[in-house]
Amino acid sequence: NYLIQKEVTYIMNRDTLKQIMIDQKDIYLNNPLITRQYFLEANVNYCFVGIRRTGKSYMMYQQIKQLEADGIPLSQIIYVNFEDERLLEMTAEDLNLILEIGLEISETDIKPYLFLDEIQNINGWEKFVRRIADMKYRINITGSNSKMLSSEIASTLGGRFVIMNIYPYSFSEYLIANNMTKNYLDVISTKDRADVQNQYNKYVTYGAFPELVEIRNKRAFLNLSLIHISEPTRR
């Protein structure tokens, strides 16, 4: 009975994870992107770190879009966001299911590209990503808790990843996000100067979290963000 129950639990977990992976495709397929000004090399594993809401997930979406543009089928791209409440009970032992399901979906023996968002939510994740990197999978991860933000993360990952700190928008990125795409280094007209000054005033007043651009009540958003930022760094 114990073995039967264990097998049923395994199947249920596998089916749930597969559904989550399918559901989450919509997240990166339907999100508009502002190309960030970070240089990313091909065939390098990245660990994107930074406080919440700086756009770490969007760095992954940007990479996925580039892979798609390079002709990589979406079936060979695996994205999992571990903030999903359906993954609360997931353990490090379950992580290999991601590979199994990815290979099943791709219907090929070619190693899929892995994007694991906020993976620090899974205890023991470090050994999994090191093993997968050693197996020559292309894998990118994000994290925002105190351990991921500390200098320890490089040694934790054993030199297998390039650690990249992600920050809120630069002012030039902020202008692009606000549909101001002229070369404002050569601003001449009075109206252009006024437009840039207006955006700069908002930039220094409210900051440049990517999500903030579309928010009307920026102050309320920032107050909520401060709560979210402090929570993971205490863990």
Give each language-model segment a name.
Residues 2-25, 176-230, 234-235:
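Interdomain hinge/linker elements that couple catalytic modules in large macromolecular machines
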Residues 59:
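Hydrophobic positions on the alpha1 helix immediately C-terminal to the Walker A/P-loop
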Residues 56:
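Conserved lysine of the Walker
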Residues 138-144, 165:
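Structural recognition of the conserved hydrophobic beta-strand(s) that form the central parallel beta-sheet
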Residues 25-41:
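Pre-Walker A adenine-sensing motif
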Residues 80-109:
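Short glycine-rich substrate-engagement loop in P-loop NTPases that contacts/grips substrate
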Residues 48:
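Hydrophobic anchor at the beta1->P-loop junction of P-loop NTPases
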Residues 147-162, 178:
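Short regulatory helix/loop adjacent to the ATP-binding pocket of P-loop NTPases
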